[in-house]
Design a protein with these regions (language model features):
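Surface-exposed acidic/polar loop and edge beta-strand patches at domain peripheries
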Residues: 1-134
Length: 134
């Protein structure tokens, strides 16, 4: 198995696995260039956040404080998948990259898309020793 990761959105770009005849095939849906990922709004292979799903009316209450977020879900006024730009649109810091492991991190600052507090996210992709698990 061969896996390709980019720090743009902490995204899985490709996973090459052998078919029953030994021919390596890419099993990830995506694009050939970073420019294509930037131009398209699909989250193919990316890390989504701060929130997955929709927050109705782009607001929520936490500890008695109402937070108004930046809506990105068309005319509905909702926020989807952490906003725009979200984690999928950010350049993540590569903290480790070797043969079997890639460790990426991103610091989402207080107020990003309206969300409160700093949030440090660390993501580890690790290929198993038998090359059959990611």
């Amino acid at each position: 198995m061969e896996v390709c990761i980019t720090n743009y959105g902490a995204r899985v770009v490709s996973i090459l696995v052998p078919d029953r005849n030994g021919k390596r095939e890419d099993v990830v849906c995506g694009f050939s260039t970073i420019t294509e990922y930037m131009e398209q709004r699909q989250n193919f292979g990316s890390t989504v956040g701060r929130y997955i799903g929709r927050i109705l009316n782009a607001r929520f209450t936490l500890d008695g404080v109402e937070y108004k977020l930046v809506p990105n879900n068309g005319k509905s006024g909702h926020i989807s998948h952490g906003g725009n730009p979200g984690f999928a649109d950010r350049i993540w810091k590569v903290e480790q990259a070797d043969t079997y492991t890639v460790r990426l991190s991103y610091l989402s600052p207080d107020g990003e898309n309206g969300f409160p507090g700093n949030l440090k996210v660390t993501l580890v992709y690790s290929l198993g020793e038998d090359d059959n698990a990611l």
